[in-house]
Amino acid sequence: MIPAIEEVVEHLSRLPGIGVKLATRLAYHLLKRDPAEAQVLARGIACLHERVYRCVCCGAFCEGRTCALCTDASRDRGIICVVERAQDVEMMAGVGEYRGLFHVLGGVIAPLEGVGPDQLRIAALLKRLQESSVREVILALNPTVEGDTTALYVQKILANFPVIVTRLASGIPVGGDLEYIDRTTLAHSLRGRRPLDCSEA
């Protein structure tokens, strides 16, 4: 393989979900296209870190200091939906069933990967609860071992706050990922969320 193509394949194959075969196909596809298209793509990728920030309030991606969801006065400020990743916000907001606010933890507790509670945005969540009149916290974490561990940890901490803590209802398969759940299932899951007893956590 030509070194220039090999270099592109190597970089592309480091991306999640892209193996060497797909990276090779993408590299050759880019070569077939108009060079201007490749330059536009390269500029877009280069500008990502210059133009996209984390919302100072919820941690979602945005192009300013605060995201559109946090500044939307029509949203219910009494409910916060806690998610693992910024892309989960887009998925949940796209359902149309949920009209509250969000909070991105930035990951889940994963001891084998060296991720503990201190590496997550749990302290920021507690600060939000102290500074506002939130009545419900929805734990919308992926139903994996790490997601369940994190949900249990957050549930335990929230026992000290006067809030109802709920978890998404069934319909999301164990080990599933919110990013791949269809909107109808996610909407049913939101409507059927169940309260958690924080005193038993």
Swiss-Prot record:
Tree of life domain: Bacteria
Entry keyword annotation includes Acyltransferase: no
Classification via InterPro entries: DNA_Rcmb_RecR, Rcmb_RecR, Rcmb_RecR_Znf, TOPRIM_dom, TOPRIM_RecR
Zinc finger (C4-type): 55-70
Gene3D superfamilies in alphabetical order: 3.40.1360.10, 6.10.250.240, RecR Domain 1 (1.10.8.420)
Cytoplasm as UniProt keyword: no
GO molecular-function term, one example from the UniProt record: DNA binding
The protein's role, per its UniProt record: May play a role in DNA repair. It seems to be involved in an RecBC-independent recombinational process of DNA repair. It may act with RecF and RecO.
Family: Belongs to the RecR family.
Protein name as catalogued: Recombination protein RecR
Native source organism of the sequence: Treponema pallidum (strain Nichols)
